Structure formats: structure tokens, C-alpha cells
């Protein structure tokens, strides 16, 4: 199967996708009513898109192409308002978080959608288990070779993005001991983790052609790598973040990725090599397991450093780019988060340690998303 040509897009433009939980009070389990909400809100949208994801308990908010984080925030805020209004009318709740803390995957209904039904046929129960919730950020690129360079550059910071956004410590009613348990769900998929090594767009087209021989890959959307090029949009898409509990944090994460992309493509601080990925999964695991307390290991020198310290270094490196893009408020907020030493997974555990229940935790998440 041939790959679409890489669509030229304005560099550093943004697109944000948020996979939201549809909740059924008063038990605060996942609902199976996303279709009802989507039908209710679609006529009210003036920008962006609200659509299905894999199962009926998931609802995806997606911006259009945005110049900066302020425009993205305005679009997401407008969508948030109409979704919350419709959810209230249908006695449902909406919240973020990378996993629902006590839902049972066996109860999840795959959407009546040709692509998702085909995916269910290919992957069986793994698709129902993939009822987890992430944030994806698209960044515009001028051409395919820039996209491949950017993908490799951003891959250096996958642990940083995971640790900052980690919001999935609970699954199936248990504390997983992970800050981000969501990504573990995808470990059984054949396309889990980093994209196989290529050095340019021509090589990527050849890789895609060979992957399509498996009959499991019809389009780029069927590849679930941590970061992937999206030729139809002319973007690189970062897919490792948990859906945050607040819109503000989602915007901050998008601002960081936009600023990092600008820094990478203007400064070209790395010469990508296949060996860069030698310890990729080990460092990724550290971020998932321990969050900002994880330890990174350099694939070339063996040097080890705290993820929190390296994240502060990244924030310093991208600050000039953030100023040029109007994303400096995002970098300031994330720097404060790192210095305080926390993420949303830590907040969730503190809520439970203070005597809260998992039901109460989901209720609190719905209140947070609604701004209460």
C-alpha cells in the first residue's frame, strides 16, 4: 500500500486531541453513552470536532489547526462548555485522567464504527482493555524529512512528557504502583513503543509499505507508536501523555511540545542515530513507573540523572522558543510543577491516603473538569 504524500503545513501550528471519560453517576463507573452526547453536541460546535473513540465510554475532543496555545485553549474551552451542558442534561459526568480507576474492561462496548470493529476483529479483547484516555498533540512540519527529524528529536523527551502528564495510578480497582499505568495497556500490541528506525521520509514510505503487507495496517491511524508522522495533516503526533484532569494542564503540555519542536527544528541539537533508541524503553519505563522521580540512563555514556532535573534542563532549553510562540506561560507552569515535585498521579494517591474512595476520586475528577 502506498503512503500519502506529506501534506505541507505551517511549521509549529498545533492540533490537540483529548480522550475524555464519560461517567455515569452516582456510581461513577464508565457510562456507555458517548454516542448520545456526540449527537447532542455536534450541531452546537463552531470550531473543532467531537467524535467517538474506541469504546462507548470514550469521547474525543479535537481542535482544528491552531496558531498557538491561546487559540487551542479557546477552541477546547468552547467544546468543554457544550459537552458539560449536554452531559448535565443527560445526567452524565465528564472527566480526565489516563485510566478509570475501577472500570472492568469486559463491560466496554466497542463503537459501531467500521474501523473500530475491524480493529476488534484483529486484536480481540486487547481493544476493550484499551479503554484508556490520552492526550495527543500534533505539530505542523514543512516537509516529510523535517517530520522524521522532529520525530527522532522529540523521542529523546518521551520520558519527560510521560512524567509531567502522568495521571493513571489506578486500574481495575487497584493501585498499580505506576505513575502512568495507561501505556502498559498497549504493550501487547505489535506496534507498541517507538517507530522502527528510518532516517528520512523516503525510508519511512518504504517502512510503511512493508508494514502494510501484514494486512493489519490500512492507514497511519492503525499504527500506535509513541510518536508518529501524520502525512495527511502534515504533522508529527506525540501520543504518550495521559489526559490531564484540567484543560489548563492539557494546554501547558501542548505548549511544551510546540516549543520543543521549534527548538529542535531551529537549533538541530541532535544528529539522529539508531543507537539513540538503545535504552528508549528502559527510560520510558522509569517515567511510567516513577514519574518525575525516575532515573534516565544515557545510551552512550551510561550517565544517570534524575528525570526531574533533566526536565528542568529541557524547560530551560526551550524557553526562548516558547517566548517566540507565545507559549512561555506553559513553560513557567510546568517548571513550577517540577519544582514542587508532583504530578496528577501523586495527587490521586494523596486523595486516597486521606481517606477518599475510588468512587469519590472519580466524582472529584468530574468536579475538577467542570471547574467546581
From Swiss-Prot:
Reaction equations catalysed: L-cysteine + L-glutamate + ATP = gamma-L-glutamyl-L-cysteine + ADP + phosphate + H(+)
GO biological process: modified amino acid biosynthetic process
EC annotation from Swiss-Prot or TrEMBL: 6.3.2.2
GO molecular function, one term: glutamate-cysteine ligase activity
Keyword vocabulary terms for this entry: ATP-binding, Ligase, Nucleotide-binding
Family that this chain belongs to: Belongs to the glutamate--cysteine ligase type 2 family. YbdK subfamily.
Protein name (record): Putative glutamate--cysteine ligase 2
Naturally occurring in which organism (per UniProt): Salmonella heidelberg (strain SL476)
Taxonomic placement: Bacteria, Pseudomonadati, Pseudomonadota, Gammaproteobacteria, Enterobacterales
Gene name in the database record: ybdK
